[in-house]
Amino acid sequence: MSPSLFRSEEVSLVQLYLPTESARPIMSALGELSTIHFKDLNPDVVAFQRSFVREIRRLTDTERLLRYLHSEIDLNGIHVPDHNLPPSYESVLESSTIEDIIERITRLEARVRQLVESSQLLEARYLQQLEFANVLTKADAFFSKSGNTVDPLRNNYETSSIFSGEDDTTAPLIENALELGTTGTFDSEETSPQMNTTLDFVSGIIPTVKFQFLERILWRTLRGNLFIHQVRADDSLIHGAEKNEEKTIFLVIAHGTQILLRIRKISESLGATLFPVEEDAPGRTSQIQQANVSISDLNAVLENTRSALYTELTFIAEHISAWEAVLHKDKTVFQVMNLFNYDQNHKCLIAEGWCPTANLPMVQKTLRNISDLTDSQAPTILNVVHTSEQPPTYFRVNKFTEGFQSIIDSYGIATYREVNHGIVAIVTFPFLFAIMFGDLGHGAIMASVALMFVLYEKTLGAKKDLDEIVGMVFYGRYIVLLMGLFSMYVGFVYNDLFSKPMSIFSSRWVWPVKSEEAIARAVQVGTYPIGIDPTWHSADNNLLFMNSYKMKLSIILGVIHMTFCLFLSLSNYRFFKRKLDIYAVFVPSLIFLEAIFGYLVITIVYKWCIDWKAKDLQPPSLLNMLILMFLSPGTLEDQLYPGQKYLQVGLVIAALICVPWLLIVKPFVLWRRHSNEENKYQSLNSDLPNVDEADALMAVDSQEKQAEPFELGEVVIHQVIHTIEFCLGCVSHTASYLRLWALSLAHNQLSSVLWNMTLANGFRMTGIVGSIFVVILFGFWFIATCVVLVAMEGTSAMLHSLRLHWVEGMSKHFEGEGYAFTPFTFKVTAE
């Protein structure tokens, strides 16, 4: 097994001296390598006070211009080609080239913005002219009915104080105001119908939803002394408006300059657009002709402007992806360079970072190549620095192991060079899942879906618009594939196919030909080759047998899993050469676990191996045995094997001894070591000649940096917590593995109920009707199986398997005090 799989890769601290003139191309090359995790050497400097803030701000402003251009491209429905950088853009470009790109983008953005503003202005004027022409046309049609002038209206006004339309082209507010006893704004002395009046009108266009408000406000304000004519605007105005709303053309006729001024103000306050319309027919005809000429001219100019804008945006769309990538890459380089120190004396940047030791030759070769290409006067220096600082944790992963590693990293990052539980989870995670989900049919459905994702991973991986759930399943496609395959295997062992048994081999239970008993009992004539005998599925005591089998199987697998994880801690202790932890932590932990639950597993297997019927004995209860083992040592209800009580007393004593062993030995040994080291240090100081005070302070400071001060209280508290957690955890964690039995039972019963409620009813029917019902019920059964049993139950079993790894398994060895290796890379930027 590769060391980088079982343990994190060895990582070295490197120090880089980068000449300022070649820093950008060097950082570009390192970003392509994705192999150095840079440290922040300016933690106390705020972001806006760092060295390359001005460059980053300018690039950010340019990216903002690109976002604006991208939005305009999307608005115009122009396709942006896929992100394919030309060869000249593969690396960070020279400063002069970047400046040329920024200037070009700035110039294009200004040009596009000017064209957009001109287009919007022309569209507004074009729409306004359309509205004006529409108002003129409707007004001319209205006045044509009344003799082409307002004079008939004036004559009619002498006999009535209010006019309102009576057909579909007018909108009456009220019946004749004189009949209601109101005379508008006239006094009692001025209500004579024969008064001389001068009528005039206001024409315009308003959104239809606001016309009713305008009508009511005008009537109430003018007390009914007006005439309103309204008509629906043409559809061309509806589609040309930004909000795509219907509009109404209105004509308000009233008398008096002040009243007309008030009408104009009220109309404009409600969003109406007013247009001047001539009273005489020749004047209106001239206005219509002028409006049509303006519409034609504006349309021609607008088409030319749109064509120019489309041409510019098409050109930009061909290059915008490359520009975005180049600017984002250059911005990323400057952001990383802000982490470095600047040496003004040597005109160079000083960087520190973590690099996998195996990649150091590749990094050095890259630095030499870049230095040769840039003809830098000063060399680029890379030094490996020896330090006691803890490096980051780095695991090399591929598309298969990435999902499993992410599951473990979600709980915590492993300490540097600690055993990687992610490689163990490749087998244990889908296997524990399958114990709960085991069904050959359901596992086949799950494996088929995952296999489809695996076969089409290139096509699906290239898509960026995957649904959230689909994307999650695609990311964990190999996890789902293994879960399905393991479920098929466990389902084969359970002899479960959609809750139904499979008679692959003949049953090893036969019924007697003649029986004198009232209830016939089957006789076992052999052992079924593999898995559960199908006869058990139809037996009356099927549930009792399967519960007992799966419950004991859960305990066995749980103890094996915890024991294996405990041995992983031994691997850690040996690797880090912590002998004290081996005999003060691992050994008592192993004895405590195996003295209780390891012994229980052995008794379960032993009880299975004994033919109790042949011995004519009642098999003892293992649960009662385990309880009496601690509550009443040496007492047995039923003996399982000779010498049982003496062995159990010895195991109890061994388990009890392990508790103070875990609690006391490690703190005591550490305290003795620290006391001896202090005595040696004091003896050494007394034997040394007089030294300079500054040298002594430097020596003390150096020791403080290398080792943390010993605190006995912290060590004792930590060990007490660990002891209590482990001892109680052995009990609770073993019980927690019973979820394997519980979920397996629930899954099987739910599958059986679903079968009996759907397909079983269809199979009872015969003939054509039965065939039709079978097809219909199969659809219901298959959909419910996929949604409820595969998706929902599968998610539940996966979460339980996840918990068994995070808590029950990893608590036996996982320290999780590391931090992730996050190299400087352009890959995340590109995504």
Swiss-Prot record:
Sequence intervals crossing the membrane: 419-437, 440-456, 472-501, 549-568, 587-607, 651-670, 724-748, 770-808
Keywords from the UniProt entry: Hydrogen ion transport, Ion transport, Membrane, Transmembrane, Transmembrane helix, Transport, Vacuole
Entry function: Subunit of the V0 complex of vacuolar(H+)-ATPase (V-ATPase), a multisubunit enzyme composed of a peripheral complex (V1) that hydrolyzes ATP and a membrane integral complex (V0) that translocates protons. V-ATPase is responsible for acidifying and maintaining the pH of intracellular compartments.
GO cellular component, one term: vacuolar proton-transporting V-type ATPase, V0 domain
Chain ranges on the Cytoplasmic side, renumbered to this chain: 1-418, 457-471, 569-586, 671-723, 809-831
PANTHER family listed in its UniProt record: V-TYPE PROTON ATPASE SUBUNIT A, VACUOLAR PROTON ATPASES
Family from the record: Belongs to the V-ATPase 116 kDa subunit family.
Compartments in which it is found: Vacuole membrane
Single GO molecular function: ATPase binding
Assembly with partners or alone: V-ATPase is a heteromultimeric enzyme composed of a peripheral catalytic V1 complex (components A to H) attached to an integral membrane V0 proton pore complex (components: a, c, c', c'', d, e, f and VOA1).
Vacuolar face residues: 438-439, 502-548, 608-650, 749-769
Highest taxon in the source lineage: Eukaryota
Membrane topology, from the record: Multi-pass membrane protein
Listed name of the protein: V-type proton ATPase subunit a
GO biological process annotation, one example: vacuolar acidification
